[in-house]
C-alpha cells in the first residue's frame, strides 16, 4: 500500500506514493524505523506485505485448534468469496470493472499466510547474521484480478453465488504486484505455496471448518 498507483513488478526502490491513509501510516512507520536506525544501535527489517490469504497448511481439521483468519465482517477478497461459497454470505461485490487491467478489475499479488510467516523467520535470521537494516517485498511476483479470484473460488468450491458490480472504492490502485527478487536473493526465504489454487483451497477448507465449530 505504500506504493500507491505505482503498478506491476514493484521493487523496494519504486517510488512511495500512498493514496490512502492506511498506506500513508505504513510509510510513516517505515521512516520512523529507518531514521531511528541511523542514530541508534538499532537495526530492523521492514517487510512490505502484499495480499495475504489462506490458512495454515498444517491445520488438523478434526479438532477446533487451528490457525486461520477469524475476522468478523472481513474485507479481504479471498475470505469474502470463500464465505459466499460455504453459505456464510449471500452475496459479494466487485468494486469497479473499468480499471486499466486485462479484465477491468483490480489486480493483486496474493501470498499464502504460511509463506509470509516463513518470510518473517528468514528475514529475522538474515538480520541477526548481517546486522543491517533492510526492506523486503513479500509477494510472489504474480498478479490475479478480482474476477479471476472470484471465478477460481467458484470453480474449486463447485458453488455459484451472487456477485454484484459496485462503484470503485476511492484509494484502490489498479494493480499491485511485488518484485520479490531481493528477499529471494538475500535471505533463505523460498516460497512453498505460490499457487492461487493452493491458497484458495486452504481458505475454503478453513471456512468450512469454522462452520463446524461455531
Regions found by a protein language model. Name each.
Residues 1-53, 57-76:
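Catalytic helix-loop patch of NAD(P)-dependent Rossmann-fold dehydrogenases
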Residues 78-214:
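C-terminal substrate-binding subdomain of Rossmann-fold SDR/epimerase-dehydratase oxidoreductases
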